């Protein structure tokens, strides 16, 4: 059985620099991307375009968008001072609120990657992602706010 440890429900959080730039343009004080804790950050597709990526590929790794990421309170904490505020949640509520999960705000997308067998993982593919690697969007469409396979 596949399992997941030390993550917040999904192994990958995807966000774009343009999405953060859009958010920061609405805030009194800009915040860094690290507040959202993404492990894949892209640039060049436009603000919140990652919301619609059903399938994309980096090197030989196919990834699948599962659901938009409903944000907890962690991004409201300044990681340098440990001080909390109501931002960025308050601003996200003005334009990134859910339709189904109306109590939440969304930033980024929860993503899973394609599973392969040991041989192809070891010998046949480039399974490392590095800064600057190109991203190829294979399929776009509506991504749900919630997942039927996970509790939210």
Q: Model regions: which residues?
A:
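Metal-cofactor-dependent catalytic cores
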Residues: 1-152
């Amino acid at each position: 059985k596949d399992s997941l440890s030390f993550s917040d429900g999904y192994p990958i959080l995807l966000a774009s620099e343009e999405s953060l730039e859009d958010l920061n343009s609405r805030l009194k004080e800009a915040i860094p991307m690290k507040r959202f804790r993404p492990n894949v950050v892209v640039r060049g597709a436009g603000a919140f375009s990652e919301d619609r990526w059903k399938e994309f590929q980096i090197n030989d790794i196919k990834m699948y968008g599962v659901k938009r990421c409903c944000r907890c309170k962690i991004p409201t904490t300044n990681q340098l001072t440990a001080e909390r505020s109501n931002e960025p949640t308050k601003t996200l509520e003005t334009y990134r609120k859910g339709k189904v999960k109306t109590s939440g705000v969304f930033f980024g997308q929860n993503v899973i990657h394609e599973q392969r067998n040991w041989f192809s993982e070891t010998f046949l593919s480039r399974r490392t992602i590095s800064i600057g690697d190109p991203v190829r969007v294979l399929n776009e469409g509506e991504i749900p706010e919630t997942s039927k396979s996970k509790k939210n």
